């Protein structure tokens, strides 16, 4: 039975921004962190999924998962199309990655996070679980400074010119994959530096938005489409540019995309096409990385480090929390 909510939707979203959405990623991060270094990617991911779904269902929203753990026949929970929340309050789209960097968590390596985005209903890109070409830079540049179809070398030179520096002062973040060898060669041919990461391209894209602190000016490469939408939600909140294209290189992938509303398989998506309305983004560290500190387990306290953002205000909050009611994390 639906519960009447008297709070105006705009105020309700603000409340979610400050508290509820943070609790969702905190719970997922703590559950995954209990399995750091255990070498079991599936167990860590499942623990995060279970915790995130449980918390989502406590929120006063009518939520639909549009970016999740897979399509209905591939994932038992948080699948694309699943309804979450209390069936009360605003209708929202939900994008989740309960554990980005499953390998990082399993090996207790830096940079694993629990992350999600929430947007006005019908405004997030419904992307199939395929690969996506991506390029991203931070705020402060004219639109079109970099382009997805330009070469990596050209994009470095164009960004360097816009920034007023030599190409050797530019650093490009790239996932360390064999498929990116040409990108790496092209970037280095200009004198620019490449920073390689093993996993975690949501956090990788976010790094571009704050080059003064992260040392990263641009992200280039091919990664998961779901992660691309989550990263776009973050940039929608904090500023920046991003261009993406789904890689639909088989009939089966094109058909899956068509069923999800993709009419042009060659379309280049900007942030505004992937996130068309007000959105919230939150991420909590699982293992300590350059973006967030990992979960810390003390004798009587659990510490979490979270960033939460909202597009309509441009507000970014960092929340370092100490949790003393520990049983709230371990409800199996």
What are these regions (language model features)?
Residues 84-85, 114-117, 215-219:
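Short basic, glycine-rich beta-strand/loop surfaces that mediate nucleic-acid
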Residues 89-100, 104-125:
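DPxDG-like acidic metal-binding loop motif
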Residues 16, 136-154, 169:
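Glycine-rich phosphate-binding "P-loop"
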Residues 15-18, 39, 103, 142-144, ...:
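A short glycine/serine-rich beta->alpha loop
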Residues 113-114, 134, 325-328:
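A short local loop/turn or secondary-structure capping micro-motif enriched for an aromatic residue
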